[in-house]
UniProtKB/Swiss-Prot annotation:
Signal peptide: 1-31
Protein name: Protein bride of sevenless
All ranges on the Extracellular side of the membrane: 32-530
Family of this protein: Belongs to the G-protein coupled receptor 3 family.
UniProt entry keywords in alphabetical sequence: Cell membrane, G-protein coupled receptor, Glycoprotein, Membrane, Receptor, Sensory transduction, Signal, Transducer, Transmembrane, Transmembrane helix, Vision
Disulfide bonds: none
Domain of life of the source: Eukaryota
Composition skew (Low complexity), residue ranges: 65-84, 874-884
Membrane-spanning segments: 531-554, 570-588, 615-637, 655-676, 693-712, 728-748, 759-781
Length: 896
């Protein structure tokens, strides 16, 4: 009743009722929000794992574990569950797609949970998936480096020494992920996975180091990844000087033997030969009954079947299989492996080894190569920490939590010119392993097979120490020699004394040492691809040039009259024949069977002569072509009114220009040949050809080409001589482009220069052929056909056509001379008008044609003897020209 009364009273008082409803609504809304905020089924926002960005205050990284996290509560509402999954999907950042588990573990990229994986197809076991634990060794640290190498233990040892020495003076350590590369074909996949791991699973990652050989193999992939990836310097810089020194100091007999060097790569061969020359030791291959073989690498031992003295230099760790493939009494030169244990004392300062290194062995060359780059990187890191971090109050070390943007220096360090080299003693001192220097030795062993039982054939192989050289002190020690040979080592002739360089050929870096003896070198065609290309171009160009030359000679013999004197065209064709034939000296070589073949004094003279012939031909044929083009360009620019000099240069002056240009170049080339022959010991053609003096030899030819280019504005509009002006312009521009191309290519090295010079010659010849001679031949053929058609028309018998034809044949300008029309009256000559239109070639200037025009002139005199001369038609552009001067006498007509 009270409620009804209240409602009834509310009808009478609506304002209190409305206020009551608003209060009830607000209370309900607050209750609902409170329930939502305290609901156990509400999940927090998921955490996205991406590459961390440096901030002003960065906390130390938290390690990611693989155990599944527990959820706060679960919901039974399907709609809410699907909605949450839809929000999580775009936030998950992973390199590999995996099934959704519905837990926060799915927020972590799969590569962070499982690490790196390799799928290997084996013939015996099928498809095998290798886990990260099988090929990755890890030293934990706050700032991480990765290494892809064949020797992960040496890389781990270097980082251990960096942390023990605390080169960065910080309260954190450097971590490393050392990835063992057993198969080079798997390196690309592992590198890509490691980049993804460092980007998504680590907070502070500096970059990745890769073995030198792998870096060269993956260089294109590394550029595409755009990550901090650097090569580890090769170990050959530490090994090859030791090999050369031990060989030089090794006791040897008095008899010299032929030396054959076998390497896996040409780069390895060149580096060893340079190390041998530093010892002034020449290891040459020649005809001999006694042979010495020096074999580099671990892959060639099983292929060695020769008899002789063998020196084997493995570049990686050796095993029993490698030693078993070597013949008995073979010498092995390799670095000793240093065993790591708790009993090894590395330095006077007490240090410790990480547990993962106990019982392992390292190679000195690997340690020194990697340590040099790491020390320089740590110095840069310490400098960056001093700018972006604060020191702690207790230990005066840089505190990681106070650092910001301290890895930005890497962009500058990755540039090689900013790096510094460190010698061996400095590396050992900085990494607190000075006492390890006595164990870093490069040793020479000799394999000996001892027969234990003659009946069963049981044998035992041992390596007998011959000599060793220390990496730090370079002191050489010999073992057992005095006892085994019953003589003093100092009284024995050394290997380096027997194979000493007998003669040094000046500064010739290609053939620096010469020998007396029988030559083993021979002639052959080069096996390079560019030789086949150049020979093809030369043969085709020679065929085309001969075809044009035969065509012109045949047409001249038939009595055709061309625009202009064909003599220059014939000379230009002959010069092109020389251009295309000049490829022969560049396509042959004088070599031996081995790269280190014995070079005698006679061989050096032969090589010097071949080089001189190449230089002489190159400069001379360029001069022939450019001189002819220049004299034609001068003539075109000096005649007519198409923008030239408006002064005439006759054929004699053209001949003088061409002859002077050629004789000047011949004189300079002959002088060079004489100087190289007289002073062959001090002046080497190889140094000229492969050095900067080559540009001095080509300076004169380049000046002629520039002169032709300077005349382009004066000749490009000329229509004379089958539009020779524009054709010379096209040919000159093509030659200039070709010159820029081959000169640029020749700057990349000797091999590029060997190909660029002859190919540039052939391309220049084809530029003249395609730009000038082939179009001109087409215009000649077209002119001959037009002349044949014009002479076949009925108007040939008309008097007007005969007079016009007579005029066109009597032009004395620019060799437009027709011998058949020279006998004309003076009145007809005075009424001729100038014309710049090229004339048509006339067929045959024989007696029948002369009799035909004589009859026409007689008929003209009988029909109209008092005919007034026609008034010349003056064009507005040539109003100042009325007529040409009288035609010269028969014996004064000159063809240009």
């Amino acid at each position: 009743m009270k409620v009804m009364d209240a409602l009834q009273s509310g009808r009478r008082k609506p304002l209190p009722v409305a206020l009551l409803c608003i209060l009830v609504t607000v209370f309900c809304v607050l209750e609902c929000h409170g329930a939502d905020l305290t609901s156990p089924t509400k999940k927090s926002a998921p955490l996205r794992i991406t590459k961390p960005q440096p901030t002003s205050q960065q906390a130390k990284p938290i390690s990611i574990t693989t155990r599944a996290p527990t959820t706060v509560a679960s919901t039974t509402d399907d709609e809410v569950s699907s909605s949450v999954d839809g929000q999580l999907a775009p936030l998950i950042s992973s390199t590999t797609e995996g099934p959704s588990s519905g837990t926060t573990a799915s927020l972590v990229p799969e590569i962070c949970l499982n690490g790196l994986q390799l799928t290997v197809n084996s013939a015996d076991e099928g498809t095998v998936i290798r886990k990260q634990e099988e090929f990755v060794k890890i030293l934990e640290g706050d700032v991480v480096l990765s290494v892809l190498t064949k020797d992960p233990d040496s890389a781990l040892f270097v980082i251990n020494r960096v942390n023990q020495a605390n080169l960065i003076m910080a309260d954190f350590e450097i971590g490393i992920r050392a990835i063992s590369i057993d198969n080079a074909s798997l390196a690309e996949n592992l590198l890509i996975q490691e980049v993804q791991f460092l980007q998504q699973c680590t907070t502070y990652s500096m970059g990745i180091f890769v073995d030198w050989e792998l870096y060269k193999q993956l260089e294109s992939v590394i550029k595409d990844l755009e990550y901090n990836i650097w090569p580890i310097p090769g170990t050959r810089a530490h090994l090859f000087p030791k090999v050369a020194h031990l060989l030089h100091q090794m006791p040897w007999g008095e008899k010299i033997a032929s030396v054959e060097i076998a390497t896996e790569t040409l780069e390895m061969y060149n580096e060893f030969m340079e190390a041998a020359r530093q010892e002034h030791m020449c290891l040459m291959h020649f005809k001999s009954d006694d042979n010495v073989y020096i074999m580099f690498g671990n892959k060639l031992a099983s292929h060695f079947k020769e008899n002789g003295t063998l020196f084997s230099v493995p570049t990686d760790r050796t095993d029993d299989e490698f030693l078993a493939d070597l013949p008995n009494r073979a010498f092995v030169l390799m670095e000793n492996e240093i065993d790591l244990s708790t009993a090894v004392e590395l330095d006077a300062t007490p240090t410790a080894l990480d547990e993962i290194l106990i019982g392992k062995s390292v190679l000195p060359s690997r340690v020194l190569s990697f340590a040099g780059s790491i020390i320089d990187l740590m110095n840069w890191l310490r400098g960056s920490l001093s700018k972006h971090c604060k020191r702690g109050e207790e230990h005066d070390l840089y505190v990681l939590e106070s650092c910001f943007n301290f890895l930005n220096f890497i962009e500058d360090w990755r540039t090689s010119e900013y790096r510094q080299a460190h010698d061996t003693a400095e590396i050992l001192s900085l990494l607190l392993m000075r006492k390890l220097g006595t164990a870093m030795n490069f040793q020479m062993y000799q394999k000996k097979v001892l027969t234990l039982d003659k009946i069963t054939g049981e044998s035992r192989t041992e390596l007998r120490e011959i000599a060793s050289q220390n990496f730090v002190t370079n002191v050489t020690t010999y073992y057992h020699y005095n006892r085994d040979n019953h003589t003093s080592l100092e009284l024995k002739t050394k290997f380096g004394q027997v194979f000493n360089c007998q003669y040094s050929a000046g500064d010739n870096r290609r053939y620096p040492f010469l020998f007396d003896g029988e030559s083993v070198m021979f002639w052959r065609i080069k096996m390079d691809t560019w030789v086949a290309t150049g020979l093809t171009a030369a043969i085709l160009g020679l065929i085309a040039t001969l075809a044009i030359l035969v065509f012109i000679v045949v047409r001249i013999s038939l009595g055709d009259v061309f625009e202009g004197n064909p003599t220059t065209s014939i000379l230009l064709l002959l010069s092109l024949i020389l251009v295309f034939c000049s490829f022969v000296p560049y396509s042959i070589e004088y070599v031996g069977e081995q790269r280190n073949s014995h070079v005698t004094f006679e061989d050096a003279q032969t090589l010097n002569t071949l080089c001189a012939v190449r230089v002489f031909i190159m400069t001379l044929v360029y001069c022939f072509v450019f001189s002819l083009l220049l004299c034609r360009a001068v003539m075109l620019a000096s005649i007519g009114s198409e923008g030239g000099f408006l002064s005439h240069v006759n054929g004699y002056i053209q001949a003088v220009i061409c002859a002077f240009s050629v004789v000047a170049q011949v004189g300079m080339s002959v002088q060079l040949l004489v100087v190289m022959h007289v002073a062959s010991e001090t002046v080497s053609c190889e140094n000229i050809y492969y050095g900067r003096w080559l540009w001095g030899l080509l300076a004169y030819d380049f000046a002629l080409l520039c002169c032709v280019g300077a005349l382009i504005p004066s000749i490009y509009r000329s229509q004379r001589n089958y539009r020779e002006g524009i054709l010379i312009v096209i040919g000159s521009v093509l030659i200039m482009v070709i010159w820029v191309a081959w000169i640029a290519l020749s700057l990349f090295g000797d091999e590029w220069r060997d190909a660029a010079i002859p190919l540039g010659l052939q391309a220049s010849g084809w530029a003249v052929l395609v730009g000038i001679l082939i179009p001109r031949t087409f215009l000649i053929v077209r002119g001959i056909e037009r002349s044949d058609i014009a002479q076949a028309l009925p108007s040939l018998t008309s008097l007007a056509f005969a007079q016009n034809n007579q005029y066109s044949s009597e032009q004395s300008v620019y060799e437009c001379v027709n011998p058949a029309m020279r006998h004309c009256s003076q009145d007809e000559v005075n009424h001729q008008s100038p014309s710049e239109i090229p004339t048509l070639p006339l067929r045959g200037g024989g007696p029948r044609r002369q009799q035909f025009f004589a009859n026409l002139r007689q008929a003209n005199a009988n029909i109209n003897p008092q005919r007034p001369p026609p008034r010349p038609q003056q064009s507005p552009s040539r109003s100042s020209v009325s007529s040409l001067p009288p035609s010269p006498d028969h014996n004064k007509i000159t063809r240009f």
